[in-house]
Amino acid sequence: MSDYKVKFVDYPAQYKVHKKELDAAWQKVMEGGDFILREDVEKFEKNLAEYVGAKYAVGVNSGTDALMLTLKALGIGFNNEVITSSHTFWATIEAIENLGAKAVLIDSVDGLMVPEEVVPQITQLTRAIIPVHIAGAVCDMEFL
């Protein structure tokens, strides 16, 4: 147990709020064995696509895989550069480098990437920018 007075995320409290619904869903999936490329996944993907207004959605097992598939779909690979914040979870950099690309890190004072820091890092090898929003603050998405 940590000595922190304020928890970053209180998972037990969040679980208690949704316990009945989560437990029922978990039990249904586990008892049916329908959790890998089956009906429940198809329903999830369809519902997610509708929710975000997309034609398709793909369920994956982790945020790392989601980042890797997105970068791969964009054709990013060897000898490419992807700009992102140094204040990110390690999986962001792992996804970039697993495809053979180079992560170009922006080290901002407040953790948010701003045009003045990003523009000088853009080269002919730059293929993407992955913004990282920190503590409820949002990067300048119009610029990015």
Language-model-derived ranges and their functions:
Residues 18, 22, 44, 63, ...:
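Hydrophobic (often cysteine-bearing) scaffold residues that line and stabilize catalytic clefts
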Residues 1-34, 39:
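N-terminal "arm"/small-domain region of PLP-dependent enzymes with the aminotransferase-like
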Residues 33-81, 94-99, 105:
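Phosphate-binding glycine-rich loop
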Residues 72-144:
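PLP-dependent aminotransferase-like
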